[in-house]
Amino acid sequence: MNKTTSSHSPIHVIGGGLAGSEAAWQIAEAGVPVILHEMRGVRGTDAHKTESLAELVCSNSFRSDDATSNAVGVLHAEMRLAGSLIMRCADLNQVPAGGALAVDREGFAEAVSAAIADHPLITVLREEIRGLPPKDWDLAIIATGPLTAPDLAEAIRAETGADALAFFDAIAPIVHADTIDMDICWHQSRYDKVGPGGTGKDYINCPLTQEQYDAFVDALIAGDKAGFKEWEGTPYFDGCLPIEVMAERGRETLRHGPMKPMGLTNAHNPSVKPYAVVQLRQDNALGTLYNMVGFQTKLKYGAQGEVFRMIPGLQNAEFARLGGLHRNTYINSPTLLDHSLTLKSRPGLRFAGQITGCEGYVESASIGLLAGRFAAAERKGVSPVLPPVTTAFGALLDHITGGHIVSDDEPGKRSFQPMNINFGLFPPLEPGALTRPEGAKRFRGKEKALAKKQAMASRALSDCASWLDQAV
């Protein structure tokens, strides 16, 4: 079909997955022409099976659709408010999945592909882009996802630096800070070391007796483990071994590795030396999330909850993210990108989707949505208006572009790791925002936690609507 002309020069989007498709749609809906470059049809990947745009490689679930008390459900709702193509096509191709939003994967991808093909301001070119965009592409978005082709990945590495591009996630679980039992745990850095920006009390420490340690090691070794996808290979290297692999190398390995007790004194029982210690380190600037240091794992999710709650102090832990180790090409976004997702070293070039370090279908699409809106605003000569950090959009964007705390003692060379949306990324509620429901006999525990989530969700949707009224 003939494409409608526009007075604006086109914006180029590289990658026709969830993020790239959403970015292209948002740009076009803003009245700016866009050229979407997708290599499938010319060159396939090890995971994709079709040439459709927005093909779902793994699950067909977009997870919870509850916008009243679930962070991903809030993100769904915000995307719908913003006119998301991905959410529109998901809703049109929904299949029964309880409280979750799951889709017919073929119908979904076909719907996205058709909408993109039919839009008068979008042109799809089936070609592989082997390097960074040429200089005459003054505005471009790279949204090539976790399976970025080798030539482009190498070009990104050359532009950003040798340590700025990761090809595998070594993900340790992340715990909501308010679910850690501080009657058992205590704050202390090893040897009370202060370090850059530290206080000497930068870690939460969980003590284990020998009996508890032995039981924990046995459970780790016996735990149900996930295998690698055929196309992932087995990327173990010593700086980033799964915790259960370390345990299998010898019963004392963990005590002399990530669970070593040296330099730590139990504040609750100073005269008794712990046999082993699990350390958790602050993961976000808000201090609402803590990651389990050195606990990258291939245990299946169900096993992780059972095994890690054996650790004293984590018996009631709620996890913002569980651990994993898998193929996932992504950049060190907090260092490389500004808050509008633009590469600091190259104005006009944005990154979007999973390559920025977000995790999950809707998270990737939402960052594509933001990148598309920001690029369209820039094309129109308007400064992008950032979403408030109180929204799901803003909380995720803030984590990617600067909310993560960088640490020098992370296993391997990186500390920024991909993250799903969760309420731990949102700023705390204002004092007094939670009040006891009228007639309620108690307001603590699960009731208070639910009320907190509901208040955060309500605030997010209200602030998102206000932001959309301002944004171009």
UniProtKB/Swiss-Prot annotation:
The EC class name is transferase
Give the matching Gene3D superfamilies.
FAD/NAD(P)-binding domain (3.50.50.60)
What cofactor(s) does the depicted protein rely on?
FAD
Q: Could you identify this protein by its name?
A: Methylenetetrahydrofolate--tRNA-(uracil-5-)-methyltransferase TrmFO
Function, as annotated, reads: Catalyzes the folate-dependent formation of 5-methyl-uridine at position 54 (M-5-U54) in all tRNAs.
Which reaction does this enzyme catalyse, per its entry? uridine(54) in tRNA + (6R)-5,10-methylene-5,6,7,8-tetrahydrofolate + NADH + H(+) = 5-methyluridine(54) in tRNA + (6S)-5,6,7,8-tetrahydrofolate + NAD(+); uridine(54) in tRNA + (6R)-5,10-methylene-5,6,7,8-tetrahydrofolate + NADPH + H(+) = 5-methyluridine(54) in tRNA + (6S)-5,6,7,8-tetrahydrofolate + NADP(+)
Organism ancestry: Bacteria, Pseudomonadati, Pseudomonadota, Alphaproteobacteria, Hyphomicrobiales
SUPFAM superfamilies in the record:
FAD/NAD(P)-binding domain
**One GO cellular component term:** cytosol
Keyword NADP in record = yes
Could you tell me which InterPro entries the record lists for this protein? FAD/NAD-bd_sf (IPR036188), MnmG-rel (IPR002218), MnmG-rel_CS (IPR020595), MnmG_N (IPR040131), TrmFO (IPR004417)
Is NAD one of the keywords? Answer: yes
Residues annotated for FAD binding in this entry: G15, G16, G17, L18, A19, G20
